[in-house]
């Protein structure tokens, strides 16, 4: 038995390391960053027609590279590059801000006008604070959370 415990002695730390997570599980992994799959929630033709690959974020227009509600991102959708506005994400935020089941975006043009005419899901009321920037997106929203 002593031989058995002596044999596994150097490997106990290896098994201990392998049993724990060897990767980071921080909150930033749940926010929207590069290569995050998103869901388009407006009724634009580009966002509604089926495609074999989900839209992905390829750039976040922020210095730290992590997008939250109200930030602009660049999407790769059906072989095209389109700008989008984040209207909901899975990451828990500060108090009294909703957490969504999916990463929701609304397609916008380069000047900030929305591509679609309706938003199908509720959007957070925290976007109303930034009303000057996204007033046209708020105008086509039906529900607020």
UniProtKB/Swiss-Prot annotation:
- Which InterPro entries does this chain map to? Ribosomal_uL14, Ribosomal_uL14_sf
Return the transit peptide range from the UniProt record. Answer: 1-30
| Biological process, per Gene Ontology | mitochondrial translation
Q: Which GO terms describe its cellular component?
A: mitochondrial inner membrane; mitochondrial large ribosomal subunit; mitochondrion
Q: What is its main location?
A: mitochondrion
Which spans of this chain does the record mark as coiled coil? none
- Complex and partners: Component of the mitochondrial large ribosomal subunit (mt-LSU). Mature mammalian 55S mitochondrial ribosomes consist of a small (28S) and a large (39S) subunit. The 28S small subunit contains a 12S ribosomal RNA (12S mt-rRNA) and 30 different proteins. The 39S large subunit contains a 16S rRNA (16S mt-rRNA), a copy of mitochondrial valine transfer RNA (mt-tRNA(Val)), which plays an integral structural role, and 52 different proteins. Interacts with MALSU1.
Q: What is this protein called?
A: Large ribosomal subunit protein uL14m
Specify the species.
Homo sapiens
